[in-house]
Every structure is written in structure tokens, then in C-alpha cells.
Amino acid sequence: MNFRNYLFACAVACLAAGCESSGEATIPAFPDGGLLREGTALTRGQLYLFEGMYRVDRGSEIFGDGLAVRTSKGTVSLLTDKDNGFAVLGAACLPDHRVVVEGYWQYPTELEAGLVRLWVDQQEVAEALCNGEAPTPDTSFTLTGAYGEGNDIPSHALALAWTKELKPWRGYFFDTAHHGACEGTDHCGASPNSLESIRLAERVGSNVAEVDVRITRDGVPVMFHDPGLSRSLVRGLFCNGNVADLSVAELLGSCEYRYGEKIPTLEQMLRMMVDETEFEGAYLDMKVGGAVLPSSRLVAKLNEELAARNSDDDPTNDRRFTAAIAITTDEVRDAWHAAKAQLQAEGITVPPCLFEYDPNLVISEGCVAWGPTWTAGSQPDNVQMVREHGAITIFWTINQSDFMKDFLQQAVPNGIITGRASTLFYLYQTMGTVPPRPGATE
């Protein structure tokens, strides 16, 4: 029985038994940490070797005919538009001076997942890596190995050949996570708006994250989408009611997200993104007006710390990160005006803002970004108008590949919010146009 038939049989058995919840994919893992635990992890600088566009010579049944590969701290990510698939891998030099690249692959909307193990074919490249060097790729660079199904040791041939460099994307195009790595109905093993899901989002293609901000009874901004604590989002015997009616202690003490994660505060989220990832920014979706002032204070404090960090004598310590307060409704706009006045009265620098529903207000409010819904169309004239005033455009929320293609080609935006980061990254690399850098007017 093949893997797909096996999963179908499991689903039928579950239905026959009267199961109440949907199936969940188990995230595969090598026994005892695989070969990575036997080697020395490649440094961040060495991982850039793997970035580029690849031809899939063997294994196209899983990854399609081509892949985009990007890296982040400790991670090599294989990204494709086939079934929104991705592979999250680590890389290490083994004692015999071979370089292994291994981890897992997954289709987030399906129950299909498996292990991946690849090898750097060119021995001279592997030797250079093991000697601490940071070689660059060319068209002779290849990776070969195998992929598997479930937790089975990989046995199906996989061969990748580097073909060209990636288009510029860092600082240009913002593949923006829709409150996490996947949608709530997916099978990624991490809940929307959790620290775990935002960490995973970077590993599957995102370089900005949109997160939802609400306020507790005692005025603490927390990450939560809905006003109420529904069973589809949280678990906990005493986890009931509305976010706004609970103190942060009650919320964190009584509630967990679907996969057991703690509900983070905005401060925890921002700290994690800055300190643990290479995210370039955060799109802070203000769900209620009451969240605006305390959120603005946190962002202003972070910006002050980053400014000091970026002005010291150590350029390797620099960290470029922009968190923008998203003005989503007239209620939030009024709260934004009040927050600005309060911060200015206290001598605090007002943080950047993003306006969702009117491009003219982006300009008049002095915001750094426009965040229109995709349902109003690609609006290339408005995209250009705000660009001429130094602002960028990030559309929300597009998960269908055909619409991604249309918006990439017609609007040339600086970003799109999506729950399909791997597909968006691949499509930007294959058919997108590199937009001007934020702040450029030409």
C-alpha cells in the first residue's frame, strides 16, 4: 500500500469510528536527530551557498520541476508551488568531511509529509565547507540523495541542480506570513499567532509576519485573532469568554493554543522576531482601538533600542527591523490619532504606521505602507501613487497561486500577506518583478 492509499485508509477508518476531529499530520523526524547530530553545523555565512533556483532532476513527483532555495539561521528551505510544499532542512559537516543536508518535507494542506536527506556532491565544495570556508555556487553545484514518506528512512531518489541566483528579495519583497506559517485548517503542527508558528513561517519562506493584536482587561497587548476564546483556537478547562474580559495572568494561566503553545504577548512576539530570526518586519494588525497606544509604546521602545544598537561601533551587531501599527478601521484610526498625541506629548518618537483601506490616507497620515485587500483588484495606479510618496504596498490575503501571479505581474507590490509562503516565494522568483526598495520613488 503506498503512502497516499495508507492515509486514505486511515481517514476512512476514522470516519467509520465516528472521529470528531480532522486528521493531523505528524511532523517527521529522523531517529536520534539523524546525521546532523553527528556533525558540525554549518555557519550562517556558509548556508548562503545553497541559495538559488534549482532544477529537480529526480523527485519532481514531490517537488515539481523546479525549486527556490533560501536560507535563514540554521535552516535551508526548499520552496515550491507544487501543493504549497516545502522542506525544512539543516546542514552539517560530518567527521569524514561529507556535507549532509537533511530534515523533512510537507504539503501543509494535506496529510503528506516525509524525510529528506541530501548530500553536497562536489567533494571540493564539501572540503571547503568543512575547512570553515564559504564557497559560492555555480551551475556545477548539485545535491543528491533521497526523500521518504512519513517517518520512513528516505529511499526515493532526489537530485537537485543549481541553475541561477535568486532575484533580490531581502529588503525588496516581503513574503508576509498570515499570522503564522500556515492557515488554521492546515497541518503544520503550529497554531496561528503563536511564537512557534512565526518561527516556522520564516523557515517556509516568509520574511515579514502579520500578527493579530488584542488587549487584555489589564491593558496588555496579546496575539489573538478572534474576540472570543473558541474551542477551534484554544484549549483549557477554564479557558472561556472574551480576551478583553480576562487579565493577562488569567489568559496565560488558563489557555493554550490548539497545539499546546502559550498565547504570547506582543512584547514576547517582537523580542522573539528580533532576537531569534531574520524577519525584516512585523505588520501589527490592530483588532481593537484599545490595543493601539500600548502597542505603540512597545514598538517605540523597541525602535529606540534598535537605533542604539545600529549606531554602535560593531556593524555585525546591526539589526534592521520595522514594526508597523496597522490602521484597520475608523475606530483604530481615532485611537491612532490619540496615541500619536500622547506619545508626542511625552517626547516619544511615534512608530511607523500602515493604513489598510484608503491609499490617500496613507499619504496624509504619513504612513510607511498601504495594506489593501486583494478583493479590490491589483490597483497598479494606487500602488504607484503611494510608492511615489515613499510608501510600500502589501496586499492581503492571497493564498491562490493564480491570483498571486496576477498581482505580482500587474501591481508589482512590495509584498503580499499569505498562508502559502513557499508558493509565493517560488512564484516571485520565477515570474515576479523586483520592486523598488522601500522609500524609492522611481
Per-range role (PLM):
Residues 1-7:
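Bacterial N-terminal signal peptides that target proteins for export
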